[in-house]
């Protein structure tokens, strides 16, 4: 059981966004002997284990046993989880701080996100050869870049009485100290009123776009879009005097993803009859 816990925590630590969940899961299957199929190809399949990656967002894996007509068993799990998602054109300034405009995604428990160092992970879409051939890059800061802080208790005496948080005001993560607007003007990415969709001047891009460009190692003008989520950077752990419990972010729903993966990998190892 200890081995399974360690593998689960390693998996959760790597799956910091839905895109990373698909990528990590795909690599697990390939390392276990699965063959990747392309949706554009015509398939003539014998007994074996196969996986299909659909645009980096969805994964289908199946094992064809010795007697495919024997049984058919299906299991599924969603690769997303409660998180804080970064909105388009997210930079906002307030009282000397630069914050991110975000949305609360899924059934997150708001107060558990306070005072936690937050990293960012997801995918960034870049200009390709033409409008029909764009590139996408996985991004994971692997370090804290933001935080949603609590006020000190002497500034909020009712904090222990059960305070309802205003998501639009009190749940905006702090990204950095505000820079001089004259030295660092911020404008929305892909402003429709701008005659140039990709202006050459670096000052046309907000701090978030510049940050993503640094992470991807590209020019800000190459960024078309992104889907980024914030995540707690602390690692999961086994706890309790007998190691009976697990504490980790993203248990909902990565435990299900890991369980489904473990099942289909085991089906390949035992070469069970039917289709899994």
Where are these regions (language model features)?
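N-terminal hydrophobic/helix-forming segments and targeting peptides
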Residues: 1-276
């Amino acid at each position: 059981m200890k081995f399974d816990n360690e593998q689960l925590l390693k998996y959760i630590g790597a799956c910091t966004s839905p895109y990373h969940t698909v990528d990590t899961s795909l690599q697990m299957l390939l390392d276990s002997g699965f063959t990747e199929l392309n949706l554009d190809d015509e398939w003539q399949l014998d007994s074996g284990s196969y996986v299909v990656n659909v645009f980096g967002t969805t994964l289908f894996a199946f094992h064809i046993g010795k007697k495919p007509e024997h049984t058919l068993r299906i299991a599924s799990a969603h690769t997303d989880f409660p998180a804080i998602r970064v909105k388009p054109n997210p930079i906002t300034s307030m009282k000397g701080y630069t914050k991110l405009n975000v949305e609360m995604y899924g059934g997150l428990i708001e107060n558990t996100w306070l005072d936690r160092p937050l990293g960012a992970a997801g995918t960034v879409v870049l200009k390709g050869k033409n409008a029909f051939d764009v590139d996408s890059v996985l991004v994971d800061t692997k370090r804290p870049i933001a935080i949603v802080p609590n006020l000190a208790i002497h500034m909020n005496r009712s904090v222990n009485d059960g305070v309802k948080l205003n998501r639009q005001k009190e749940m905006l993560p702090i990204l950095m100290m505000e820079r001089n607007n004259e030295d660092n003007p911020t404008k929305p990415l892909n402003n429709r009123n701008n005659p140039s969709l990709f202006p050459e001047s670096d000052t046309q891009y907000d701090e978030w776009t510049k940050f993503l460009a640094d992470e991807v190692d590209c020019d800000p003008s190459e960024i078309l879009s992104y889907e980024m989520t914030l995540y707690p950077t602390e690692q999961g752990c086994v706890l309790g005097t007998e190691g009976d419990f697990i504490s980790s972010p993203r248990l909902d729903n990565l435990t299900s993803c890991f369980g489904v993966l473990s099942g289909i990998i085991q089906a390949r190892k035992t070469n069970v009859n039917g289709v899994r």
